[in-house]
């Protein structure tokens, strides 16, 4: 079981709702993933009209928890305003907070992120901040009141997997009581498994599933990858070594020489 603020879930895979070939495929992929939490962009819903209504109907049919996001926001003011609109529209105090600082890498503006998180938490929000793997930034977010922190593995949509494993491991070691979710940059189920093997509580992704040749099958693959990674972490992974260590004993009499 896993807790996000006061909500308990069983799935450690969170997925986005954008970029799918069709709404029907999106719905089937979410079901196949087993995800209980999906991210939704306010900008998509705010467009309104029949398209927005149809999308919202599909989401409601899935019986999942919606995590609105502030995707595309590039200032503290814009992110805070978007979060407040999302709370009104979706009826939730949850917000996946994004404050983008660079258009090419979509790297978070971590200074603005901490400022926006502080403002929103004081206003009663439960913030899921998208950040880099920087320990100081994560610590500042926790000090501001975030009980969930979501560092990236790599730039959004890059599919590179975990670039700075040591930094992510340090975050896990230093923030043992915080729910940590690897968010962005995962491209393969093995990447998700690796994040869970590090002790991360969950992963959030979108493009790797939505842009796969078969999004539904890929969603199922990520579900299995997450389950495998968590099981491996709980089982206790052996430590890596610099030198070989024989797995077969070489001391004693060979079995074919033993006297019965």
Curated annotation (Swiss-Prot):
GO terms for biological process: thiamine diphosphate biosynthetic process. The keyword Metal-binding does not apply. Pfam families: ThiG. One of its GO terms (molecular function) is thiazole synthase activity. CDD domains: ThiG (cd04728). Keywords: Cytoplasm, Schiff base, Thiamine biosynthesis, Transferase. GO terms for cellular component: cytoplasm. It catalyses: [ThiS sulfur-carrier protein]-C-terminal-Gly-aminoethanethioate + 2-iminoacetate + 1-deoxy-D-xylulose 5-phosphate = [ThiS sulfur-carrier protein]-C-terminal Gly-Gly + 2-[(2R,5Z)-2-carboxy-4-methylthiazol-5(2H)-ylidene]ethyl phosphate + 2 H2O + H(+). It is found in: Cytoplasm. Its EC number is 2.8.1.10. The active site is at 96 (schiff-base intermediate with dxp). Its main location: cytoplasm. Catalyzes the rearrangement of 1-deoxy-D-xylulose 5-phosphate (DXP) to produce the thiazole phosphate moiety of thiamine. Sulfur is provided by the thiocarboxylate moiety of the carrier protein ThiS. In vitro, sulfur can be provided by H(2)S. Belongs to the ThiG family. HAMAP family: ThiG. This is Thiazole synthase. It comes from Bradyrhizobium sp. (strain ORS 278).
